[in-house]
Amino acid sequence: MIATSDLRKALGCFATGVTVITTRIAERQVGFTANSFTSVSLSPPTILFCIGTARASYVAFRSATSFTVNVLSSSQRTLSDRFATSGDDKWQGIEFVEDALGNAVLAGAAAAFTCHKRNTIEEADHAIVLGEIMEFRQCPERVPLVYCQSRYCLPKEVSGDAFMALT
């Protein structure tokens, strides 16, 4: 049997970006922090994210027809922490604009992808949500926030010589 805590540590060796995924349901914004975001295809442009089915926000995302993935910048660690918690008060004082589909695009994000939801696949205690990108925004000058080994990090370029020394 696999020990959950050991598996979590091993999976934590994979560095990821940090996102806040948003949707709008019945005139209210819903959002949560996720690092389980990845591209699926460029044609058609498709992405996916995973969400725990026990999360309070899962019901909203299950019924939503669209969502936006906000890729957080390195200055948005507190935003990541805030959206990792439950409760409606997490939107208090948050600066955002609504995209063409009504979802929140967070001010200061490194990138944002507005998607029509294509499919939701429930697996174990999570759901995989696939979306087709309808529009995107990016600010290349913003450094993305990274999460690895249970810590926030900044990406750092590795020179060819340094990389060779590690292999």
Question: Where would I find each of the regions flagged by the language model?
Answer:
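Basic, polyanion-binding surface patches
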Residues: M1-T167
